[in-house]
Amino acid sequence: PRLRRLTGLSPLRAP
């Protein structure tokens, strides 16, 4: 559950 929150911000910050 905590990894999903980080994954949502990771893709948005990558591009």
From Swiss-Prot:
It comes from the Eukaryota. Keywords: Secreted. The keyword Zinc-finger does not apply. Expressed by the venom gland. This is Beta-campsomerin. It is found in: Secreted. It comes from Campsomeriella annulata (Wasp). GO terms for cellular component: extracellular region. Belongs to the bradykinin-related peptide family.
